[in-house]
């Protein structure tokens, strides 16, 4: 049987909208994951059953078994001793929803992907990219269980290292999809100063570093201490004796709540300054309306995010405000990806043609 011929304009639009939907689902997944963490729900399911775990407990006996499993881990005895079954159900549903959404994303990616390939809609370069993204998605599921497993034995919470890895990998997949969607757009290439391309790339890299630091803050609950601003521990820059009291010194960068919060603050200031300079440079360089708009939107989002971060800290991490802070972080990342891709697209005409899009 011969496959039907599909018009290029139509099939590229279909692929783009599918990828946009996948990016939105991943953003939702990150927010649900954030709510799961903030409600202390992440360890409520102590088993990893990729297929049979799709169904929640359906009887009183099954609920009792799930609750008994939770009672065996340190978090229950040290943090939630005396919790009722109804209280357990609340945290269970958060974690179950998070895992179910992950399974749904996997299916929502794989089935259309296979269909698009069967219809011959995907050029070879695009297929390779999408297979890599799918592989990263599978890895993300394994990393999620690796993270949960860290809190089932001696710890009462998951490892902050694994939490940060889980978050950054999710947002790396999200960014790869956003970048790919951009590369499927038919746009004229831009001639922009090299320094704008460099600063956009630096901003994107530092946003990922900041996301990692933010996950460390969350994992260590470092946002619930040193709740003053602009000072921290009584001064703008704490003493080195307080910042680096653990040995070896580099462990403080990941384990010391003061150091982790301090580096998160300093990275925020750095990002804000570079974003402002990038916007000014785009305007002065007359880099084009799209580049200027992108730079201004990015600077505005950075300003909003910094403000939300300060408010979240001063109010000791209320759940709603913390989730808004996390949501705006995704917006900042999206704008950083779009701006970097926009400025680097001038050197990527061949890549866009390899994806089946003619560059103007």
UniProtKB/Swiss-Prot annotation:
EC annotation?
1.17.99.9
Q: Which GO terms describe its cellular component?
A: plasma membrane
Q: Which cofactor does it need?
A: heme b
- What terms describe the molecular function in GO for this protein? metal ion binding; oxidoreductase activity, acting on NAD(P)H, heme protein as acceptor
Is rRNA-binding among the key words of this record?
A: no
Subcellular location(s) of the protein: Cell membrane
Q: What's one Pfam family here? A: COX15-CtaA
What keywords would UniProt list here? Answer: Cell membrane, Heme biosynthesis, Iron, Membrane, Metal-binding, Oxidoreductase, Transmembrane, Transmembrane helix
Entry's transmembrane regions:
14-34, 104-124, 130-150, 161-181, 200-220, 272-292, 294-314, 317-337
Q: Which pathway or pathways does this protein act in?
A: Porphyrin-containing compound metabolism; heme A biosynthesis; heme A from heme O: step 1/1
The UniProt record gives the binding positions of heme as 264, 325
Its chief place of residence is membrane
| Recorded topology in the membrane | Multi-pass membrane protein
GO terms classed as biological process: heme A biosynthetic process
Domain of life here? Bacteria
Query: Which reactions does this protein catalyse?
Result: Fe(II)-heme o + 2 A + H2O = Fe(II)-heme a + 2 AH2
Q: List the disulfide bonds.
A: none
InterPro entries hit by this protein: COX15/CtaA_fam (IPR003780), HemeA_Synthase_type2 (IPR023754)
Quaternary assembly? Interacts with CtaB.
Q: What does this protein do?
A: Catalyzes the conversion of heme O to heme A by two successive hydroxylations of the methyl group at C8. The first hydroxylation forms heme I, the second hydroxylation results in an unstable dihydroxymethyl group, which spontaneously dehydrates, resulting in the formyl group of heme A.
Q: Which family does it belong to?
A: Belongs to the COX15/CtaA family. Type 2 subfamily.
Name of the protein described by the UniProt record: Heme A synthase
The organism is Nitrobacter hamburgensis (strain DSM 10229 / NCIMB 13809 / X14)
């Amino acid at each position: 049987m011969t496959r039907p011929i599909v018009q290029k304009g139509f099939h590229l639009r279909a692929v783009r909208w599918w990828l946009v939907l996948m990016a939105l689902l991943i953003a939702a997944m990150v927010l649900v994951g954030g709510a799961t963490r903030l409600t202390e729900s992440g360890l409520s399911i102590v088993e990893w059953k990729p297929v049979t775990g799709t169904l929640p407990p359906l009887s009183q006996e099954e609920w009792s078994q799930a609750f008994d499993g939770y009672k065996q881990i340190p978090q229950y005895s040290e943090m939630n001793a005396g919790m009722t079954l109804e209280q357990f159900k609340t945290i269970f549903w958060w974690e179950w929803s998070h895992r179910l959404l992950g399974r749904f994303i996997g299916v929502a990616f794989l089935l259309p992907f296979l269909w698009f390939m069967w219809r011959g809609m995907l050029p070879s370069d695009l297929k390779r990219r999408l297979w890599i993204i799918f592989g990263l998605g599978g890895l993300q599921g394994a990393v999620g269980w690796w993270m949960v497993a860290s809190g089932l034995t001696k710890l009462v919470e998951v490892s902050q290292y694994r939490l940060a890895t889980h978050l950054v990998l999710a947002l790396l997949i999200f960014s790869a999809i956003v970048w790919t969607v951009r590369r499927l757009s038919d746009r004229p290439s831009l001639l922009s100063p090299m320094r704008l391309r460099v600063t956009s790339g630096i901003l994107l890299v530092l946003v990922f570093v900041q996301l990692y630091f933010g996950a460390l803050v969350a994992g260590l609950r470092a946002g619930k201490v040193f709740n003053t601003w602009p000072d921290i521990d009584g001064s703008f820059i704490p003493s080195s004796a307080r910042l680096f009291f653990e040995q070896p010194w580099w462990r403080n960068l990941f384990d010391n709540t003061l150091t982790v919060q301090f580096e998160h603050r300093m990275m925020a200031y750095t990002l804000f300054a570079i974003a402002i300079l990038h916007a000014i440079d785009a305007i002065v360089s007359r880099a084009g309306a799209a580049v200027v708009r992108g730079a201004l939107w990015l600077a505005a989002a950075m300003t909003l995010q910094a403000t939300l971060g300060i408010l979240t800290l001063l109010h000791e991490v209320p759940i709603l405000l913390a989730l808004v802070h996390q949501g705006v972080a995704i917006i900042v990342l999206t704008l950083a990806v779009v701006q970097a891709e926009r400025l680097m697209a001038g050197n990527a005409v061949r890549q866009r043609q390899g994806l089946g899009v003619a560059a103007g």
